[in-house]
Amino acid sequence: MKSAKGIENLAFVPSSPDILRRLSASPSQIEVSALSSDPQRENSQPQELQKPQEPQKSPEPSLPSAPPNVSEEKLRSLSLSEFEEGSYGWRNFHPQCLQRCNTPGGFLLHYCLLAVTQGIVVNGLVNISISTVEKRYEMKSSLTGLISSSYDISFCLLSLFVSFFGERGHKPRWLAFAAFMIGLGALVFSLPQFFSGEYKLGSLFEDTCVTTRNSTSCTSSTSSLSNYLYVFILGQLLLGAGGTPLYTLGTAFLDDSVPTHKSSLYIGTGYAMSILGPAIGYVLGGQLLTIYIDVAMGESTDVTEDDPRWLGAWWIGFLLSWIFAWSLIIPFSCFPKHLPGTAEIQAGKTSQAHQSNSNADVKFGKSIKDFPAALKNLMKNAVFMCLVLSTSSEALITTGFATFLPKFIENQFGLTSSFAATLGGAVLIPGAALGQILGGFLVSKFRMTCKNTMKFALFTSGVALTLSFVFMYAKCENEPFAGVSESYNGTGELGNLIAPCNANCNCSRSYYYPVCGDGVQYFSPCFAGCSNPVAHRKPKVYYNCSCIERKTEITSTAETFGFEAKAGKCETHCAKLPIFLCIFFIVIIFTFMAGTPITVSILRCVNHRQRSLALGIQFMVLRLLGTIPGPIIFGFTIDSTCILWDINDCGIKGACWIYDNIKMAHMLVAISVTCKVITMFFNGFAIFLYKPPPSATDVSFHKENAVVTNVLAEQDLNKIVKEG
């Protein structure tokens, strides 16, 4: 009788908790457990039945050498020694009232609080403060882009080492370290506000048509304020060092502490909270930007939010995050190395690791010498690498849209930047959180196997791919823009903002303040030829505009003036916004529904002792191929659709003011479809390559035959014990 089909799996090695469970069982139970969980034992047992006089050497000497009647105290001490389960507290302080926290739910609560804090700072406050920091410290956009990338660079450099060494360490204390670093990074990021001095206002910008204007000096000199760039980068590097253990060791600790069918629900909840953080960060940051940057001078200055010189108090949110993050250090450090019941939970788990020819030594990974071999082992796991590449492709598109969706909404549907950002956040954040929770819930509800979770992720990606073509439907024609798509009623030229009607106004392209008159949008009141504003009216209204032909009366003033222009963009005639938001919301849900299943699949398809390292590799590759290049690729793509650049009086090109809406929609569809196809390809290839461990049918077959072979098996086991 040959070994059963599918049993031979070198990667499928039982963990030490399973050994403890079998030591306390009766001989018959030992036989059934061995047949159902120990591949090498299963391969050797049929041969022993054929030749009982030749005892087989067991690959696990500790199993046969231990007597079957091990005491409960012995088992308990072995369990505590292996998993170091303990009570919640610090040193000798372990009050009973705090033991309610010493559960998976208690740890999940603290994990979620730290994930929310990290999301508030890194993906909320930093993103919303970048433009203010750029103006305050006189930096180029390329430099502020480097600030944004510093977090991912730090994460990439540290993720492998933290995940490898942290796997053998005290994971909750690693998360206490993460809370410390996140708080420190937030504090460092806010320091330039306290050392750069008081913000000095420049002169008011004249936005109307004047025949004489002071010339602008183009002598460039490097400002000392730009040196604070290095402080911001240091803050981001510290934040990256804090985020590394949070999303590698924290996820692995959650997976350790709960049964397999609940793991996806816990992980999905934790990831959903990390998405909730940016939502809070955007709301908090937006409110703080309505406060003047120098709080003490806020009431004494005449400048308002409508003034281009206005800068908000971007730094307050970082101080609040610093305090909150450091308040989590002590709670995390009070958790034991393993929560109570971890040994029992691990004993009941069945490995679903992908079968390969790699070494699966139980002691593998305990020494630093094993790091290169462990890294090589994971890189040779084709299923794992396919899943990592699929998440990287998905990360590229999600980070790109997270950065530029407000810009797309603003330009396609003619909205203000603040309202577009609000709508973008209202679609992205709830959709992503709902998708994460729903994906984790479905995997947990139906107790999907590793292969089924990959199939589920493939299905959700397919739905998201189909709905991604919403950008083709949502495209809107550009509204008439004088000098860009409209030629000043035939008196000017396309591509030139200057026309005979404003030639004597000495207008500057350094200040973009759009106005609308006669259904046409103008770059500024000056380019519309407006010489006078109407005071104390919201929105601001201009009259005596030489470039606007149709006369419009202003009834709110004592006199009647003609040739009116109103501040702001012209109202768009495109009514596709509600449909676009609804469909894109569904796209986001299905996109993020695959996140938790893929993470669970990665945890299941690798060796138990390499899960943290696997997550570290995933996050490193995800950032190298996804989150770092994603915004850059999206930025270059959107810039390629620009039809009106900001060129100041010194001839230096800045940001883009007007985009070709049709071309932008087509380009975003091309990126979305390409990334989704890559994601589905690697998901499908992972499903094709995956070789599961013994199926339930194989295990049931052995359990049914265990009764027949029980007597011979007990004799064989006793013989090995005597010889040992």
Curated annotation (Swiss-Prot):
Keyword entries, A-Z: Cell membrane, Developmental protein, Differentiation, Disulfide bond, Ion transport, Membrane, Phosphoprotein, Spermatogenesis, Transmembrane, Transmembrane helix, Transport
Protein localization: Basolateral cell membrane
Official protein name in the record: Solute carrier organic anion transporter family member 4C1
Disulfide bond positions: 501-530, 507-526, 516-547
Membrane topology listed for this record: Multi-pass membrane protein
Residues on Cytoplasmic side: 1-105, 167-172, 255-274, 337-377, 444-447, 604-612, 691-724
Single GO biological process annotation from the record: monoatomic ion transport
Membership in a protein family: Belongs to the organo anion transporter (TC 2.A.60) family.
Reactions accelerated catalytically: estrone 3-sulfate(out) = estrone 3-sulfate(in); L-thyroxine(out) = L-thyroxine(in); 3,3',5-triiodo-L-thyronine(out) = 3,3',5-triiodo-L-thyronine(in); chenodeoxycholate(out) = chenodeoxycholate(in)
PROSITE patterns the record matches: KAZAL_2 (PS51465), MFS (PS50850)
CDD domains: MFS_SLCO4C_OATP4C (cd17463)
Record's keyword annotation contains Transmembrane: yes
Organism whose genome encodes this protein: Homo sapiens (Human)
Tissue specificity note: Predominantly expressed in kidney but also weakly expressed in both fetal liver and kidney.
InterPro entries documented for this protein: Kazal_dom (IPR002350), Kazal_dom_sf (IPR036058), MFS_dom (IPR020846), MFS_trans_sf (IPR036259), OATP (IPR004156)
Role this protein plays: Mediates the transport of organic anions such as steroids (estrone 3-sulfate, chenodeoxycholate, glycocholate) and thyroid hormones (3,3',5-triiodo-L-thyronine (T3), L-thyroxine (T4)), in the kidney. Capable of transporting cAMP and pharmacological substances such as digoxin, ouabain and methotrexate. Transport is independent of sodium, chloride ion, and ATP. Transport activity is stimulated by an acidic extracellular environment due to increased substrate affinity to the transporter. The driving force for this transport activity is currently not known.
